[in-house]
Every structure is written in C-alpha cells, then in structure tokens.
C-alpha cells in the first residue's frame, strides 16, 4: 500500500508520467492496466493539473491493481475481445508496472498481463505492443486427442515453442524430437527452422502443432521429410504438394471455377469475405487470369509494394478459379498483407471494408502504369463550368493514377463548400474508389440500470430502459419514471465502480458518456433539490478499517459494499445522523442474536417510520431550532472522524426494547421499534469534500452537526465514509443481502424489428448538405480563417463497378455501436440516373454481383459473402471454406455491409467491360459512353441513355 505524504505522490506522478512517454523497442515487455483503475489512481495522485482536489485522500485510494474488467470470466490471462488502447486499458513499460505493483500490489488471484513489443511493417518498420497473443494447440504425435492450449507472441521462435511443448509433455532432454504444423485432418508441415518466429512461419490463431519423438531404432513415426519444396519456407512430405497454399482433396478436377472457399486462419473471415467479393468481380478476375497484370507490374513505385501484393493476389485468384480445389488456405496472402499493412498482421477481427480499401489501393499502386508521377497544382473552379472543371480534374488524376483499378472502380464526385461568413463558394471534383453511404442513425439505445428506492427494505430493481441515442440524463430518468412510477425529478443517476461513486451525473449531461460496461445506479430522493433548503444530499461509502501493525496507531481502510445517496437534514445531531444511516441500511445489517450481546440489538432511532414523510422514506424527529451550530475546530484533521459514542451514554432518541427478528436482518417492525443502543456503535463517520473536512460540530454531549451549503457539493469527490471495524463488519453486515437485487420485466425486453430503409435513402443522405463540425473546419481562402462551412457532395460520373459501403459501425470516445438497420437494395436495375448531376453521364443502370455480410455486433461477429459466379450466372454463399448455392431472396438482409454493383453495359463480350483503355479517360470524365456497332442500333440503350440525362 502506498503511504506517505504529498511528496511521495509527487514522485509517483512524476515517475509514471515520465515512463508513459517511453519509446517502444522491439523485444521489450509492457503491461496492461485497466483504465478504470488507472483513472482512480490519477485522482489519488493528482495526475492531472485540473483534478487535484482529492490528491492524497485515502477515500479515493485506488487499492490493489484490478484488471478483472479486461479478462474473460474464469481465465486469468485471456483478454476480452476488441479492447481498445486508452479506452479500456493503459500500457505501461516494465519499470512503470513494477513501481505501481510495489506501491499498490496486484489484486489477489490475478496475474500480470505482460505483452511483448514486436516489429511490424515491410519497408517502414514500426514497433507495436502485441496485446493479443497467438493461441496455439499443442499435442503429441502418438496422442492427438490430448490437446493443450498455450499463447505465444508472434516474436517467439519455433525453438521456444518446441521447448514449451517438451516441458508440457515431460519429454526427456536426450530424446530427439521434431515439430509439425498440422492442417486439416492429414496434412502435416515440418517446422524445421528453430530461429524463425511465429510471424515468419505464418502460424495462425488456433493452429495445431504436433511434436514427434524419434523411435528407438532411429526412424521417425511420420517417415522422412523432403526439404526441397519450391516456394515454401518449410517443407512437406514428398507425397504432398505445397506451393504457399494448402488444398482440400488435391487432384479433384470437377469443381466449378470460382466456387472455392477460403480457410479461416483465425479471425480472418473479414479477409475471406472481401476476397470473395473481389474474386467475383468479372473485369478484375479476367485481368489476372489472362496474366495482363504481369506486363503492368510496377516494381519502382514508392507508394506501392514492389508488386508483391499484386503477385500474391494473382496466385490466389488462379488457384480459386482453377476448378481443382473446393477450398484453399490463403496463408501466404495473409502474410503478405500483414507485411505491408501491419494492422492486419495479427489475428484479431478486422473491418472487411478497411481491408478492401487497402487491397484496392495496394493493387492500384502495384499496377500503376504511371512510372513517374508529375507534380500537379490543384485548381479551384473559380466560376468555370462544371464540365470543364470535371474534365480537368479527371485528366490530372490520370496523369498520376492509371491502372486496372482506376479503369474499373474509380468515379468522380463534386464537392461544394460555402463559407458562412463571406459566402465564398469552393467547388472541386475528386475521384473516389467506393461510396461510403451513411445510414439513418439509430435514434434509440437500451441501457440497463438499477433503481434504489427510498424505502430501505426494498431491494434495488434492475430495469432496461429505452433512451434517445443522442440524449441526456434527464431522458434516462424520464424513461425510468414511466416504468417505475418514480418522478424523474426525484432521481439522481450515478456510475458505481469499485465500491465508490465513479460519477454523479447532472441532468443535462450527454448519455453518450455512459458506456455499455458501466454500472448505473439511480437513487430515489424525495426532496426538491432546488427548493428544499432544510436537507442536503450526501454520497455515503462503506469502509473497513484496519491497523498497519499491532504497535502503531496508524490505520488504513478499504472500501466494500455498495455506496448510496441519502438526503439528511441540514442541521442534525450525530446521534440522529447515525440512526438515519443505520435505518437506511437495515435491509442488510444483521440484528444481534448473540447471547453474549447483553446490551440488546442494534441502535436504531426512536419511532422511525419507514413509510414516513422524510426524504428517505423515514420520519425525522427533532426541530431545527434544537440543533445549534458552531465554528469549525481549528485542530480538525483533513479527514476528520466523528468519535464513537461513550460506552456509558445513550442516545437521547434511544430507549430499551427487544429484538424478535428471526432471520437476523432488520425488518420493518424492528426498524420502527424502540431499540436499545449498542455499547459500541457499528461504525464511525468521516466526511470528505474535495479533500476538506466539511462537518462542523460541537464536541459536547449534544454533538450538533451543520452541513454548510457554501462547502457541501453533490459530487463523487464529496462523501461520507462509514468506517467499520472488521469484527463488527463480519458480525453484523450481510454482504450477500447488500448485493441482492430484483429484476423488472423490462429486462427481458427485446427491441421491435426496425423498419427498413431503401438504398436510395442512403444515397440521398450522402448527397444532403451538411454543416462541418467544430473539430473539422474548412480553411476559407477569403477569410483566411477556419470556418464551419456547409458541404455538399454530388455524383458526377460512376465507374463500371460501383462499390457501396454501408456505414454500419460508429465510434465515439465513450461508445462503439453497430447499426443493424435493414437496407433494401435492388439486385437488378439499380438506376443511379437521378443522383448524377452530369447531364452526359451515360449508362447508369447496375446489377448486383457481390455482397459482404457482417453478422453480430461491435464486440465480435462473423463475415460471409454472397457472390454471382461470372461463368454460370448463379448466386453462391461463401462462408470461409464452405461454398453453397444461394437464392436471390436470401441476399437482402440487415447483415449486408459492402455491395458490389456492375454496370449493365459492361457485361457483354468476355466479361471484361467493353471500354477501350486509351479512351477511358475522356469517357469517365465526360460521362459519354463509347458506342459499338451493336450498341448504336440498340433502342433499349438509347432509351437508357436518355433516361440518364439530367433534367431540371
């Protein structure tokens, strides 16, 4: 436990602040600390200059480091999925962790969460703490049913793994062994490079490793291996073909080309889904299958990947479209992606659309036909016609970017910004590779809260309330009032963490500050907080006192139980305040049944009416005129204790009585009764308000108390602590009863199915004028200042393949959420003409060819894909290694995340769009389609082109 004065806390604050700035170095060890514990520590040491009110205050002492909030239940080392740095945890270097542990210790039963710093990136190296380890399954060759799971860092070597396996299975040091990587049911790959790391070897989450012991006669149970397999860092037995991908049922030749699944390497369904959508984009796949990419590989582009991504992509596409395999394992492709985009190098679930964006950009730069990009000065429209500015913007784009990706996926939109001060209009035309469409925001969210009633005998009740997504605390209280009948203005909303009030909310605070994992308690207080001048509301916490040693008078304390809010008379006596507190806790404070307790039962106040008219449901005795006040004691300490009652004295409100409680807990009758006083009170008081003592009383027999409104604040940093002696706590405090609660029927509430929105609604929302946020202003060249301008996006020209990203995921400082709105999108004949402002836009009808689906929420989920095979024209469902037929009525669902549309005029011929590359630039910029002899006589196309004309 940390002790000492402010100087010691200054050292703590300074040391940790310095160590938090430590640079990451490959191989170093860092430690995770739960952010909620760390925030409490920051309060205690006055870490932030604006929050030093409680510095050194034992009432906010953080206690032992508690990382339980980061861990899965029942697992001392397995982290919850999708934890976010700084939001959920803080990273500390070894020295910083050791200091914190020496000052505060670690919660009993917990282990340090240590993680290595690994190096990532192919050309630009950078270090990163590997928060999530790779879980491997280990077994012996002779007994593969006995599987042991262990977690390793990507920086760990094969030798490290083998030593761990030998240790697990008690293999003697003199016994010769070798290690195998087991795929599927009967495919094995020897891991014979002991210095290679897990990352180098391409081992993935859930991979099975088999250790094999040499026979006594010098032979190996699995036979000899052949270390000469081409294109592999590791070798396979000679009977197994291996070229970067592992196949199911080698030699099978009756598969429909393209109907090839992708094995899940461990949370890689996002990659599989994205790849299946691209694989079933006919123009792109034909380009790679016909080897056109080889003549356009750009090895010198500083923005590219030296052609590695394009070559790896091509190899995988060829395997999937060979018709030989029902599925392949894209291990080499995953490794290449991780080398150039370290964010995808691990085995955490990632965003499919983010990977698509990387792949499209990476393929573009690897295949960019421009070998030397010229510098181009961007120009504003300055009143010029849109057609002129659009053509100029597209030509400039092609001078630096010209690839198959541009040919297929790039379009042009118009951006208009208007300054609110000087009315300056800025018009630019910018290329896009995909459209990210906003969804109508979910207007509501559900929160689980606990309502604590005034009646002390009533258990807290858990409710599920529906509140506005963009609302405030008053909205929560209003919703809870409808369910409970408690007026909203009689509620106070709090966040309880680690036996203390983490936050006490004001009614106008935003609900976005409440996170999903917060424990929200709402207290009923029967006073008008703005008009009642006779009462004050105080937060009350429970503490267990203890001595540091038998020969010292220095004491410490630790919090326990649930804190509560309580309204008490502003002028009071110590006796009456004690009685009010005791009655407030009577549901879980035991009545003495010991025969040795000759003085009787607990000390409760006389004639206290549980259902009375007091602010806590308790009738209050005494006139304010009886309660005198006095100036504060100059000798009072910062955290002043109200002394225990003299053993020979008795409260003026206490008279003798009997206790007939059968279950050992206070009942309504016993609380109402006239109970005798204890020889010794169960607890004493300590009040703290922003580090100052705010209870003033006279040290005489009456012990009058006055709460000063100039000093008292309803704040999580101001509270009354009830200090319990350990023996009395153990004897009289029922912790199980204190934690008990009931569930309201609303907890079982399931939100009704939401009405669907049309894809066109999302496009309209995309093109709606909006005001820029204060955090994202526009620099006005006229005003020479950043302004919150209005911005409007319009579509000018569309590409042959239109990728539509439905923005389902939203992120904020306090919350992560997924919109599960059903978007109704057409499978055939998506007509985009009404959204194109270019009067010569050309063909603009699309058919759906692929969909990436995401099932689940922010905390996890699974990606799959629907795609239309370019050869047989049928729909299929791709779920990792599984491929099955699908019907069109399955495709539109609330799981749809990324849509791939192909323009109808590009389906003719070989499947590659009938646009000549040399003239593609002018066509895309102007929107005028190139006509073939066939098209020029096609009345349907004439009608379609006419329909695409902009009309006003």
From Swiss-Prot:
GO terms for cellular component: cytoplasm; mitochondrion; nucleus. GO terms for biological process: BMP signaling pathway; monoubiquitinated protein deubiquitination; negative regulation of antifungal innate immune response; negative regulation of transforming growth factor beta receptor signaling pathway; protein K27-linked deubiquitination; proteolysis; transcription elongation-coupled chromatin remodeling. The modification Phosphoserine is found at residues 932, 936. Residues 627-644, 931-945 have a biased composition (Acidic residues). Phosphorylated. Phosphorylation protects against ubiquitination and subsequent degradation by the proteasome. Ubiquitinated, leading to degradation by the proteasome. Its main location: cytoplasm. The active site is at residues 269, 862. Residues 598-666, 923-952 are annotated as: Disordered. The modification N-acetylalanine is found at residue 2. It is found in: Cytoplasm; Nucleus; Mitochondrion. It is an enzyme of class 3 (hydrolase). Residues 260-904 form the USP domain. Pfam families: DUSP, Ubiquitin_3, UCH, USP7_C2. SMART domains: DUSP (SM00695). Residues 7-118 form the DUSP domain. GO terms for molecular function: cysteine-type deubiquitinase activity; cysteine-type endopeptidase activity. The modification Phosphothreonine is found at residues 226, 573. It comes from the Eukaryota. Residues 2-223 are annotated as: Mediates interaction with SART3. A homodimer structure has been reported; however it is unclear whether the protein form a homodimer in vivo. Identified in a complex with the COP9 signalosome complex (CSN). Interacts with SMAD1, SMAD2 and SMAD3; the interaction is direct. Forms a complex with SMURF2 and SMAD7. Interacts with TGFBR1. Interacts with SART3; the interaction is direct. May interact with RNF20 and RNF40. May interact with PRKN. Interacts with INCA1. This is Ubiquitin carboxyl-terminal hydrolase 15. It comes from Bos taurus (Bovine). The lineage of its organism: Eukaryota, Metazoa, Chordata, Craniata, Vertebrata. The gene is USP15.
């Amino acid at each position: 436990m940390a002790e000492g004065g402010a100087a010691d806390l200054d050292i703590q604050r300074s040391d940790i602040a310095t160590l938090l700035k430590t640079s990451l170095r490959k191989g170093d060890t860092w430690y995770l600390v739960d952010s909620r514990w760390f925030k409490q520590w920051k309060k205690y040491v006055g870490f932030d200059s604006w929050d030093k009110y409680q510095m050194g205050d034992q009432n906010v002492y953080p206690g032992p480091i508690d990382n339980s909030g980061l861990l899965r239940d029942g697992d001392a080392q397995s982290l919850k999925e999708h934890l976010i740095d700084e939001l959920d945890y803080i990273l500390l270097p070894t020295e910083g962790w050791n200091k914190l542990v020496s000052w505060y210790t670690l919660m009993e039963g917990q282990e340090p969460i240590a993680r290595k710093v690994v190096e990532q990136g192919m050309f630009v190296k950078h270090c990163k703490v590997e928060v999530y380890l790779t879980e491997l399954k280990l077994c012996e060759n002779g007994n593969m049913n006995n599987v042991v799971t262990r977690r390793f860092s990507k920086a760990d070597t094969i030798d490290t793994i083998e030593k761990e396996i030998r240790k697990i299975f008690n293999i003697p040091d003199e016994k010769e062994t070798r290690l195998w990587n087991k795929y599927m049911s009967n495919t094995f790959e020897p891991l014979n490079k002991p210095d290679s790391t897990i990352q180098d070897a391409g081992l993935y989450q859930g991979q099975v490793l088999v250790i094999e012991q040499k026979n006594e006669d010098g032979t190996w149970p699995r036979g000899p291996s052949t270390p000469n397999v081409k294109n592999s860092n590791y070798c396979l037995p000679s009977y197994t073909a291996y070229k970067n991908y592992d196949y199911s049922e080698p030699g099978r030749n009756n598969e429909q080309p393209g109907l090839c699944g992708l094995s899940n390497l461990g949370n890689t369904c996002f990659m599989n889904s994205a790849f299946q959508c691209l694989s079933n984009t006919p123009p792109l796949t034909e380009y790679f299958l016909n080897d056109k990419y080889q003549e356009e590989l750009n090895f010198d582009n500083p923005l590219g990947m030296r052609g590695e991504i394009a070559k790896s992509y091509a190899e995988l596409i060829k395997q999937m479209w060979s018709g030989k395999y029902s599925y392949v394992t894209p291990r080499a492709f995953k490794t290449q992606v991780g080398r150039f985009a370290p964010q995808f190098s691990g085995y955490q679930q990632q965003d499919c659309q983010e990977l698509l964006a990387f792949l499209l950009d990476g393929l573009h730069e690897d295949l960019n036909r421009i070998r030397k990009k010229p510098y181009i000065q961007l120009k504003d429209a300055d009143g010029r016609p849109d057609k002129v500015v659009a053509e100029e913007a597209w030509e400039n784009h092609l001078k630096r970017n010209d690839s198959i990706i541009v040919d297929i996926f790039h379009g042009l939109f118009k951006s208009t910004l208007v300054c609110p001060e000087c009315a300056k209009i800025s018009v630019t035309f910018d290329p896009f590779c995909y459209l990210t469409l906003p969804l109508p925001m979910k207007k509501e969210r559900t929160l689980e809260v606990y309502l604590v009633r005034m009646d002390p005998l009533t258990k807290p009740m858990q409710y599920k309330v529906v509140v506005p997504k963009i609302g405030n605390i008053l909205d929560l209280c209003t919703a809870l009032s409808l369910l409970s009948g408690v007026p909203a203005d009689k509620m106070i909303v709090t966040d309880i963490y680690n036996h203390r009030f983490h936050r006490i909310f004001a009614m106008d605070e935003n609900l976005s500050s409440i996170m999903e994992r917060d424990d929200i308690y709402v207290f009923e207080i029967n006073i008008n907080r703005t008009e009642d001048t006779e009462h004050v509301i105080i937060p009350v916490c429970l503490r267990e006192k203890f001595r540091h040693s038998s020969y010292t008078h220095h004491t410490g304390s630790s919090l326990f139980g649930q804190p509560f809010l309580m309204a008490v008379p502003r002028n009071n006596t110590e006796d009456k305040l004690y009685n009010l507190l005791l009655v407030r806790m009577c549901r879980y404070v035991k009545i003495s049944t010991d025969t040795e307790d000759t003085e009787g039962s607990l000390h409760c106040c006389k004639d206290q009416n549980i259902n009375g008219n007091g602010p806590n449901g308790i009738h209050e005795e005494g006139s304010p005129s009886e309660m005198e006040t006095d100036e504060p004691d100059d000798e009072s300490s910062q955290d002043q204790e109200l002394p225990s009652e003299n053993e020979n004295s008795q409260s003026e409100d206490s008279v003798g009585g009997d206790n007939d409680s059968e279950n050992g807990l206070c009942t309504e009758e016993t609380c109402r009764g006239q109970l005798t006083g204890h020889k010794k009170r169960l607890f004493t008081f300590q009040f703290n308000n922003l580090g100052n003592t705010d209870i003033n009383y006279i040290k005489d027999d009456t012990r009058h108390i006055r709460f000063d409104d100039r000093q008292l604040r309803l704040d999580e940093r101001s509270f009354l602590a009830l200090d319990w002696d350990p023996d009395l706590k153990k004897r009289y405090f029922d912790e199980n009863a204190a934690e008990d609660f009931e569930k309201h029927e609303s907890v079982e509430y399931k939100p009704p199915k939401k009405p669907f929105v049309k894809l066109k609604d999302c496009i309209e929302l995309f093109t709606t004028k909006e005001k820029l946020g204060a955090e994202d202003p526009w620099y006005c060249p006229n005003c020479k200042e950043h302004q919150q301008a209005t911005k409007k996006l319009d579509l000018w020209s569309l590409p042959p393949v239109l990728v539509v990203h439905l923005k389902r995921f939203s992120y904020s400082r306090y919350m992560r959420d997924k919109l599960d709105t059903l978007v109704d999108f057409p499978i055939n004949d998506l007509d985009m003409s009404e959204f194109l402002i270019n009067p010569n836009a050309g063909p603009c009808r699309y058919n759906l060819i692929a969909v990436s689906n995401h099932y689940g929420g922010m905390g996890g989920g699974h990606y799959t894909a629907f795609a239309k095979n370019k050869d047989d024209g049928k729909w299929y469902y791709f779920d990792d290694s599984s491929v099955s037929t699908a019907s069109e009525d399955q495709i539109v669902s609330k799981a749809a995340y990324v849509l791939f549309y192909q323009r109808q005029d590009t389906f003719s011929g070989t499947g590659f769009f009938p646009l000549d590359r040399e003239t593609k630039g002018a066509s895309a910029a102007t929107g005028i389609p190139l006509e073939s002899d066939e098209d020029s006589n096609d009345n349907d196309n004439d009608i379609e082109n006419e329909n695409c004309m902009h009309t006003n």
